[in-house]
Amino acid sequence: MCHIIVRADSDINSVHDLLGKTVSVGEEESGSQLNAKQILSAYGLNEKMVKEENFNYADSAKALVSGEVDALFWTVGINATVVEELSRQCDIKLLSIDKEVSDKLKSAYSYIDCKVDGNTYNGQTKDVNTVGVKSVLIVSDRLSNDKVKALTKLVFDNANELQLTVSADLDIIEKDAVTGVNIPFHSGAAEYYSEKGIEVKTAE
C-alpha cells in the first residue's frame, strides 16, 4: 500500500502540492521508488518539478522529522511499524490519491484501491484513499503441476494462520488473489483456481 506522508504542520494537502518540493521517493530501484514515480507522473509531476531524494526508510524518516524533505513515499503494508514509529517522532498526515488519478493508475499499472482507516496511525484521524500493489508468490515453471497445486492449496488452507503472523490485513481470498495479476499463472495454480470456479491465464 502506498503511503504518502508529510508533516502535520505542512501546507501540503494533496499530491499536487508537491510541485517544487523535496520528496524522498525511496531507494534506487525499489518498489517505493517505482510507485512514487508512477504516482507523481499520473499527477503530471516529473523530476524537474519535484526534487527527488533516494533515502532508505530510516533516512527518510529522519529527513522528514528534520525538515530536509517535505514528503516521503513508502510502499508498505497497513499498520506498518515504520509509519507508526515515524508518527511518534513527529505529527504526520497522509495524503489521499484522487479517484481520477487512482483510476488512471489502475488502468495503466493494475494498482488496486486501498484505504487507510482513520486512527490507523498515531494522530491520523481521517480515512485516506490510496492505491496498493499485490504481493505475488513466484515459482519456477519447472515445478510440477502437482507441487504447485499443493502449494497454492496450502496457502489458502492456512490463511487464518498466516494472518496471525502479521498485523496487516492479508485478505487471503481466492477471487481477490487473482485480481490485477498480469503475469501468467503456473498450470498447477490454474488447476487449483479452476476447481474453485476461477479461470486464470497460463503461459501455455
Predicted regions and their residues:
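Bilobed "Venus flytrap"/periplasmic-binding protein-like clamshell domains
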Residues: 1-66, 160, 175, 179, ...
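Residue-level signal for pocket-adjacent positions within structured domains
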Residues: 7, 13, 111, 116, ...
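Pocket-lining segment of extracytoplasmic ligand-binding domains
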Residues: 10, 47-139, 143
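Residue-level detector of anion-binding/catalytic polar loops
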Residues: 22-24, 70, 199
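N-proximal short alpha-helices
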Residues: 33, 37, 121-128, 162, ...
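Generic signal for short, ordered secondary-structure residues
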Residues: 43, 130, 171-172
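An extracytoplasmic/periplasmic, membrane-proximal ligand-sensing/linker region
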Residues: 55, 59, 65-66, 76-94, ...
